[in-house]
Amino acid sequence: MIKILFICHGNICRSVSAQYIMEDLAKKNGVELYVSSAATSREEIGNDIYPPAKRKLKEKGVPFSRHYARQATMSDYLSYDYLICMDENNMRNLNRMFNNDPDHKIYKLLSRDVSDPWYSNDFETAYNDINEGCKAWLEKLS
C-alpha cells in the first residue's frame, strides 16, 4: 500500500485538510492508500484542526476526526513513500530536516504554492487548491 504524508508548517490547516481530502477521494475511488499529515515546525504540536479549516471540510462534506498536530520525523521519512508539501518553504525545511532527500520522496502538492489560510484567511481557495492537487496525485498513483 502506498503511504503518503502531507506536510505544511503547523499541521492544523493545509496538510491535515489534504490528509482528509485524500482519504475521502481514495475511498470514493476504491484506491487503497495510507495517508497522514505532519508539520515542519513544533509550534502547533497537539492542537486540533484549526476551526475555520474544520468548518470548510464540514461544508464540503469531507469526513474528519479529532486530530493532534505533530512534527515530521526521520522515522516518517523512512516509512512513507511520498512526503507532499504545500509550499516551497515546507520543501526547504524538509530537505534541511532530511539530509536533502536522498531517497527522492519530497514533492510539492501543486506546481504553485498552496496559499496558507492561517495568514490569508481564504479557506475556500486553500480547499480548492488542495482538492485539485489531491485529485491529480490520486490519478498519478492509481
Predicted features along the sequence, with ranges:
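Phosphate-binding/catalytic loops
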Residues: 82, 88-142
